[in-house]
Regions:
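Acidic catalytic motifs of isoprenoid enzymes
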Residues: 23-30, 34, 75
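Acidic, Mg2+-coordinating active-site segments of isoprenoid diphosphate-utilizing enzymes
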Residues: 72-86, 148-154
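Helix-adjacent hinge/juxtasegments
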Residues: 80-123
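His-Asp-centered metal-binding catalytic motifs of divalent-metal-dependent phosphohydrolases/nucleases
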Residues: 61-80, 100, 104, 123-129, ...
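Divalent metal-dependent phosphate-bond-processing catalytic cores, especially two-metal-ion Mg2+/Mn2+ enzymes
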Residues: 3-18, 22, 35-42, 46, ...
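A ubiquitous short alpha-helical element
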Residues: 32-36, 87-93, 133-134
Length: 202
């Protein structure tokens, strides 16, 4: 809890966050942080939450909840379960969006949230009102910043340069000026710095 934020019901809010974290801690794929393996989707949710609160210390209850469940249990529908084509990728992403929203809705209902709040969280997860809604822009900035800070180096190491540059340009195009300012402060490796420069220079 940060800024002057007060959840509508602190017990319900904390219960929902705890349940999201419990689910994501079941991720069998881990990532080492300071030499300690952490469940990947749990880690992703913590990083996304951190960026949302850094960008918007007074973030709304629905935005905080959405940040914590954006990729809820993503490992349950692996990429390999769809054809390894562009169409297969888009189909996989569309299925995942609905899957995350449904699972998040189940947990929010279990926590005692009303359908109206559940709908607002799911709309953020599904990017339904992006970019019109300010909260959706904060979440998108946070998603892009997690990518730039924690995933860019891995992508650059296994992807053709033009595809990485394209991914960077797409991310940059979705970000607000505030998000871009934070992105330029990140500590990039030499290769990633050069790729970002290339992407921004078009």
């Amino acid at each position: 809890v940060s800024g002057s934020f007060q959840p509508s019901d602190p017990q319900r809010f904390e219960f929902a966050l705890r349940r999201f974290d419990e689910e994501n801690r079941r991720d069998p794929t881990t990532e080492a942080v300071a030499g300690v393996p952490q469940p990947r989707e749990w880690l992703y949710a913590q990083r996304l939450t951190k960026w949302v609160l850094q960008l918007s210390p007074d973030a709304s209850e629905e935005l905080r909840l959405a940040a914590r469940c954006q990729h809820l249990c993503r490992w349950e529908i692996p990429r390999q379960s769809y054809p390894m084509t562009r169409a297969g990728y888009l189909q996989w992403r569309a299925t995942l969006k609905k899957f995350h929203a449904r699972k998040a809705g189940d947990i929010l209902r279990e926590a005692g949230y009303a359908d109206e709040m559940i709908g607002r969280v799911q709309d953020l997860n599904l990017k339904k009102n992006f970019p019109a809604e300010p909260a959706s822009r904060v979440l998108e900035d946070a998603l892009c910043l997690v990518f730039l800070e924690f995933q860019l180096a891995d992508l650059a190491g296994k992807t053709a340069e033009d595809k990485t540059v394209n991914a960077l340009q797409k991310s940059w195009g979705k970000m607000t000026e505030a998000g871009r300012a934070e992105a330029l402060k990140l500590n990039y490796g030499e290769r990633e710095k050069a790729l970002l420069q290339h992407a921004l220079n078009g």
